[in-house]
């Protein structure tokens, strides 16, 4: 079972994403409300995947993704936002993330395509 850490500053989205992913067979092992706590949680929990919001209150998701993926054995990172991927272009590719899924398109199948 793929383990997941959800990093997003909106508790409602974290709860919705948790329910959706758990219903599709993922094991959500943690949640974090901002970039710094997400980096710490990724190091402590060792998830297979970090679902990471682009817009966080302390750090942007692109820099968080770079920090998480810089370590050997790092989890896969998938960026997400309520905005469309075309708004971010090369920032996604340069972040070390596997890809981007808009929040409205989030599903286990969409994540599996990126892993």
Spans of features found by a protein language model:
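Active-site T/S-Asp motif of two-component receiver
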Residues: 52-53
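Hydrophobic/aromatic residues positioned on beta-strands within the core alpha/beta folds
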Residues: 79-80
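Acidic catalytic/metal-coordinating carboxylates
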Residues: 34-37, 60-63
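The feature encodes the CheY-like receiver
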Residues: 57
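Short amphipathic alpha-helix used as the core "switch/output" element in two-component signaling
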Residues: 62-73
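His-Asp phosphorelay/catalytic-motif detector in bacterial-type signaling
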Residues: 46-49, 72-76
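Alpha4 helix (beta4-alpha4-beta5 surface) of REC/receiver domains from two-component response regulators
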Residues: 63, 83-101, 105, 109
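Two-component/phosphorelay signaling modules centered on CheY-like receiver
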Residues: 11-30
């Amino acid at each position: 079972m793929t383990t997941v850490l959800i990093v997003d500053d909106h508790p409602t989205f974290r709860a919705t994403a948790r329910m959706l992913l758990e219903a599709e067979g993922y094991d959500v092992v943690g949640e974090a409300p901002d970039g710094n706590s997400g980096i710490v949680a990724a190091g402590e929990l060792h998830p297979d995947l970090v679902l990471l919001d682009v817009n966080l209150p302390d750090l942007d998701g692109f820099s968080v993704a770079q920090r998480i993926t810089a370590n050997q054995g790092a989890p896969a990172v998938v960026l997400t936002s309520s905005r469309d991927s075309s708004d971010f272009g090369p920032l996604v590719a340069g972040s070390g993330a596997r890809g981007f899924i808009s929040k409205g398109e989030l599903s286990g199948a969409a994540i599996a395509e990126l892993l």
